Amino acid sequence: MKKILFFAALFCSPCILSHLYAQSIQNTDWKAFIADPLNDTLIIHIRTDSSFVTNRNGEVLVRSSYTIAGDTLTILDYGTGDYVCPDMKGRYKFIRSGDNLAFTLIDDPCEGRAQTLNGSKWVKASK
């Protein structure tokens, strides 16, 4: 019986940990100052399966849907606007360490998004 419980725990642990890890940035807000060409503080509002980016005045710049698989974020913009890259999926590795979040580019045909996210350091924003 102990062996069955051990193997069940061993088998289920990666599934549970993966789910918890994937949940780690959902329903959070992150801010960073982005220099040229924006020269503004941006806030990424990450919800359950979508996100949106606002500037310091609260103006929505981009809306996106996303999926998380392990430490990989796949993002796809929708809607219209100056900063939207419709039909262009971007993939980023992300690392959350407490109140800090960092993105590393895997691949993204959207130059503006890649420039903004790749290597950027975000701090958890207070609500």
Name what the model sees in each region.
Residues 1-25:
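Bacterial Sec-dependent N-terminal signal peptides
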Residues 5-6, 99, 127:
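Sequence-pattern detector for short linear motifs
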Residues 17-31, 43-47, 119-127:
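N-terminal helix-cap/turn-to-beta initiation motif at the start of protein domains
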Residues 33-41, 53-110:
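Contiguous, well-ordered beta-strand patches that form the walls/edges
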Residues 47-53:
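Short, flexible N-terminal segments of the mature chain
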Residues 113-115:
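Beta-sandwich strand segments
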